[in-house]
Amino acid sequence: MVAQITEGTAFDKHGRPFRRRNPRPAIVVVAFLVVVTCVMWTLALTRPPDVREAAVCNPPPQPAGSAPTNLGEQVSRTDMTDVAPAKLSDTKVHVLNASGRGGQAADIAGALQDLGFAQPTAANDPIYAGTRLDCQGQIRFGTAGQATAAALWLVAPCTELYHDSRADDSVDLALGTDFTTLAHNDDIDAVLANLRPGATEPSDPALLAKIHANSC
């Protein structure tokens, strides 16, 4: 009995040969799964990244009995990308709190100073006093402050840009309710490094375009 089990046989008890298993269905299933997996990976790798659109800022409140508040002319992202950013030590930035979160302007001003911006100040936003700026925020500047605005825009790339009538080179960063922290990645760091004292290489226009194409 043991010998028969050990030796085995190719026939059943009626003397008929055992049927061999057909491997074709298993091969078909495996091939199908391989194809499906390849298609899924191809779609995942070739799909363009989702680009988050920043919320449009609400207009400023209009005080009764006074002239309407004018933010200035909104500047397009395309036009601003062509502006070369200023050296960080030459910047004059005012961080304005319009988010309703106490102390946020001071925190962001400190973070800007850590990056190399020259002694940013912090205060409440007089334009949105008594209300909140429901968006990422706004960068407001005059003609003399365009380069500073371009440097500031590197770390606040989702803000709206407004060219106003101020004559000096100061720039306001008004923080909205959606603003959480300054932007940070390897490309931004590379550009900021070229804007610090001692740097001799100019900012790379292609890198600037890449930063602002992928931010919002």
UniProtKB/Swiss-Prot annotation:
Its main location: membrane. One of its GO terms (cellular component) is membrane. It is a single-pass membrane protein. InterPro entries: LytR/CpsA/Psr_C (IPR027381). The keyword Chloroplast does not apply. It is found in: Cell membrane. Disruption phenotype: Loss of the gene results in increased sensitivity to nitric oxide (NO) and lower growth rates at low densities in rich media. The mutant has substantially increased sensitivity to two distinct antibiotics that inhibit peptidoglycan cross-linking (vancomycin and meropenem) and to rifampicin. It also shows increased cell envelope permeability. The mutant is highly attenuated in mice. The chain crosses the membrane at residues 25-45. Keywords: Cell membrane, Membrane, Transmembrane, Transmembrane helix, Virulence. The keyword Methyltransferase does not apply. Contributes to cell envelope integrity and virulence. This is Cell envelope integrity protein Cei. It comes from Mycobacterium tuberculosis (strain ATCC 25618 / H37Rv). The gene is cei.
